[in-house]
Amino acid sequence: MNPIESSLLDQTTSNSVISTTLNDLSNWARLSSLWPLLYGTSCCFIEFASLIGSRFDFDRYGLVPRSSPRQADLLITAGTVTMKMAPSLVRLYEQMPEPKYVIAMGACTITGGMFSTDSYSTVRGVDKLIPVDIYLPGCPPKPEAIIDAIIKLREKIAQEISEDRNEFQQGKRYFTRKHRFHFGSSILIENKEERFFHQSYESRFESTLEITPKTSEPISEISYPFKNLKKIREVAGE
C-alpha cells in the first residue's frame, strides 16, 4: 500500500498544496512506521527472521523491531503459547501504548496447532488472551505471506483513520433561528443603507436616541449654554 494513497490526502487538492491537520499527519506517520515487538517461541519465528535480510528487506515498510513494549505499536506472536507464558504475554500487551495491533502468525499461535491435542499446558489460540487484528495461518507461513499480512494491517489502519475523520468532520455552519436578525434603518439615512441589528441591542439603540420632551420646541431650536459666546466676545472687545 502506497502511503500517498492514504486518507491524509484529498483527491480535490492540487499537487503542490496539501491541506491537513496535525492529527491526520500523525496518523499518516503512524501508518508508515509500524514498530513491532517480536514474540517468537518456536519455528514460525525463523521464517520471520528471513525478512530482515536483503531479499525481502522489511525496513522499506517502516518496520523497526523494538525490544521494549513501551516503544512498540505492533505485537507479532509466533509459535506455541503455554499457560506459564500467558501472564507475560498479557503484561507485554498491556504495556504497549495505544493504538496497538496484534498479528497472530502460524497455526500454533492461532489454534494451538498439534500441541493443543490433549495438552494441559497449551493455550488454544492467542485470541483467548489478547485481541488479534490479523490472523496469518501456516506451518510455518512464508515470508511473502508475512509481508501480505503487514500490508493488510496497514490497509485496516488507513480505513480506521478515514472513518475517524469522517466521524468528526465538521459540517457547514449556519446562523440559527435564535439569532433573530431583522432589517433596520441605518444612521446614514441619506444613503438609504440597510443593516442587520440584533434584537437584544434594539432596545439599547432606541433608548440612546430617545430624548425626554422638556419643551415642545424642535431639537435644533433648543438653547444651549455658550450658544452666543461669539457675540459676547465681540462686545467685550476680544
UniProtKB/Swiss-Prot annotation:
It comes from the Eukaryota. Gene3D superfamilies: 3.40.50.12280. PROSITE patterns: COMPLEX1_20K. It catalyses: a plastoquinone + NADH + (n+1) H(+)(in) = a plastoquinol + NAD(+) + n H(+)(out); a plastoquinone + NADPH + (n+1) H(+)(in) = a plastoquinol + NADP(+) + n H(+)(out). One of its GO terms (biological process) is electron transport coupled proton transport. The keyword Metal-binding applies. Belongs to the complex I 20 kDa subunit family. NDH is composed of at least 16 different subunits, 5 of which are encoded in the nucleus. This is NAD(P)H-quinone oxidoreductase subunit K, chloroplastic.
